């Protein structure tokens, strides 16, 4: 029995109580069920009403469709007649197995019999279950309308007066959402134990926070992070949102088992499937699929090697009108959302296809007026045929550009964020296949005919490549071949490329500079472009983060004056054991983190500015995950954005004043706290002096008597008299300074 959301508490936050091992799910799974005899029957409605003499002819015509789902015969079709010897418009059909009956419902329900009649196919068991006496009221009763309940503002965090960003922090068994406060400690928004069992994930525009459980996923949002939606998918382990947050895809290695009579959005349509595409607004599945990449069964293990899970299994077009999946080596299937029907009723057959990627933005190609979405794919060398890169226009499925490649070992497709370019990274082997090298085939998508520029000056293999967001520059990392048995990986080289200055359009891509003898293996561009962090992650010996500026405002080297870049290393910092680097959505801050999912040494996260200044170090026990909350695209037009940039210096003055005011407030708070502590100390002294004066008066001592001498001359009090001396020490901070050494 698959897990259900019913097993979660109301708040989904409390610890699970310890229980004895429950074998009920195994018993239910392997329980021998008695054959009830009706599982093989289906009922077909929507048939033409015909006289008795035409009934057999109709049955023969109907069998053509019925046989497509399973084995049946004329004798297994019963079409009842009324007292006028006319058919009733429905028939009972028996299949050989219950599985064939289920297949008939899935394949034939809603299909047209002719121009005037559409089949409605249901299992006889379902009709008996739901249409039984007492299940349906004879009189119509209007549904109860729930009172209107105002929903929470799902983008309330964008109205923060200080324009702060939020982030989610997963450590131990707790997940918290916090405001980033620059130099000051983060401000907590919400912090909950057992909020997720695997990981948390923001939607692309930051509206939803997804938590993952054995029962499925849940979406949270609003100022208080209330539960918004539940999507039951037993043992789900992967989640992917569509670009505009209208759909979410879930995947589990275990096929779904839908129980008879079970409640909830899952139906027999999802039985045996691994992938579900959900409509987030309605909370209902659009369609479910079997995973292509599951491991082969025991009988096939020798014939077919085990495959890795390809994720995301479904890839969305930029406008969410289409979603596609690939059957590696055979075809690409493109579906139209939200109906999820196959575009053109057929998959696109592409022999040997290995990978594909949609353009991340809707592209307006030169000379093309009709609407289109573009996807790029590649195929390897097959026999005497060369490897091939193709660009397809959707919905027409027209191949608008191809490029043949030779001596290919592997290909990676990299779209620029605006769809202006697509870089095809081609790893080539020599004819002897003893050495490897990489060259770049850059498609200029918006130009007429989609010309291709080749960058073949690279001598080594490219292990990482990244375009500048909303720009035309890129960074890549190369490395030489690793000697067999080498204990230390070879050094890497970091290369920066930029287009030549050429009037209003971008020229050819040229090398700006190469930094040799590095250990870097990862590239992280600021989401706003210009700044980039080149880091060494998942390493046991190097942990450096290099902060680069591609538009440095200082003097430009003579040899780079014709290029659209001025490269400058701003700072290098180290973070021991770093595994991840994340930019905030505004491009102002960078977080480097070391997750316990990779290693258990010095886990935690550090906050840096875009220029590499470390603002805080946060060692965190059992730290797992840090993710910034994304922001939706700006609502300002290009002209309004241009105006903001023009007046940026004026705005900066206002921001500087606000920062100074915030510091003054913080300093004022410190001074006020010190004054309060001092006043409490003085009040305590005054109270003690008053008590001392009362004691002197009670013992008849003069007020000006020497208290210290009197205390020295006083007789010692024995311990058995029950008296104790209470000593209180109060420390006062006179001054506190903080000095940052650059």
Swiss-Prot record:
Domain RRM: 40-126
Task performed by this protein: RNA-binding component of the eukaryotic translation initiation factor 3 (eIF-3) complex, which is involved in protein synthesis of a specialized repertoire of mRNAs and, together with other initiation factors, stimulates binding of mRNA and methionyl-tRNAi to the 40S ribosome. The eIF-3 complex specifically targets and initiates translation of a subset of mRNAs involved in cell proliferation.
PROSITE patterns, A to Z: RRM (PS50102)
Keywords attached to this entry: Cytoplasm, Initiation factor, Protein biosynthesis, Repeat, RNA-binding, WD repeat
Subunit structure and binding partners: Component of the eukaryotic translation initiation factor 3 (eIF-3) complex.
Name of the protein described by the UniProt record: Eukaryotic translation initiation factor 3 subunit B
Segments of this protein annotated with the region Disordered: 1-20
Localization, UniProt: Cytoplasm
Presence of the UniProt keyword RNA-binding in the record: yes
Main location: cytoplasm
Single GO MF annotation: RNA binding
Family indicated by similarity: Belongs to the eIF-3 subunit B family.
One Pfam family, short name: RRM_1
Top-rank taxon: Eukaryota
